[in-house]
Amino acid sequence: MTWPTIARKEFADALGSRMLWAIVIIIALMTSLSAGLSLLIPEMEPDAAVAIGGASQFAALLVPIMALIAAYLAIAGERESGSLKVLLGLPPSRGEVLVGKFLGRGGVVAIGLVLGFLVSGVVTVAIYGGLPLTAFVGTTALTALLGVSFVGIAIGISALTATRARAMTLAITAYLGLTLLWDLVPNAVHLLVTGEMPGQVVPAWLLLLQGLSPTGAYNALAQALLLGSGTAVEARIGGPAPAYLHPGAFLAIMLVWTLLPLVVGYLGFRRADLS
């Protein structure tokens, strides 16, 4: 059994467990609801681009936890049950198992997110009569990449852990640390350096710190896509944007968060005693 075979099996198993359709339904429902929010806020002018921005904000919170749930037991669950020893006896290498499970689970999450966003795109057209295609396609692709990044994190966690309970603990910690609590660190650094909390205009390094998490990088890229790559940043820092705030830098951060956990997970998994 090779990694493509493992990837296909992971994808088929996810279809059988309705994981794909759960992702589609949840993302379609939440992003479609966000598309109509501007109609309910009197101070906000109804606009399809604003609706896409709202959908990306919902996605930044929902996608990480969905991707982690989809993948955190991919290796740890089979390791605890003993079925992983059977799989490794077929025989794929441990690296092939990790790559196959990442591609299979990552494919399920990415396809589910794309389908969910397509539904919300139809809803947006129905509400606003049109859709800014470039912004929509770009946001959809970024959201799929965010999902794949957290699948990489989840597979890395799963490869490093021997039990379901430990994998779950680390997955929850990753979600809290990289999504809900990350901004506390840049704000605390700003307070220590300047003696005050961030205001309307902030130093450029603060935006870099905020964007060092996969969710922060996603938010920075989505904002650049919807508002213009330089406009939003220059307004926030009150001057020209340095090179390290270029969208390419944040894209690289997301790719690092996708691949580095896999490498770390593989190094631990390669030495693990499965007996």
Predicted region positions:
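Hydrophobic/aromatic residues in alpha-helical transmembrane segments
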Residues: 64-71, 119, 153, 169, ...
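Membrane-interface alpha-helices at helix entry/exit sites of multi-pass transporters
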Residues: 93-107
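Transmembrane helix boundary and interhelical loop/hinge segments in multi-pass membrane proteins
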Residues: 47-52, 68-90, 102
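Hydrophobic alpha-helical transmembrane segments
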Residues: 1-61, 65-66, 99, 136-141, 168-169, 235-275, ...
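Terminal transmembrane helical anchor/hairpin motif
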Residues: 37, 41, 180-259, 263
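Secretory targeting signals
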Residues: 34-66, 104-165
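Central hydrophobic cores of alpha-helical transmembrane segments
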Residues: 25-28, 168-178
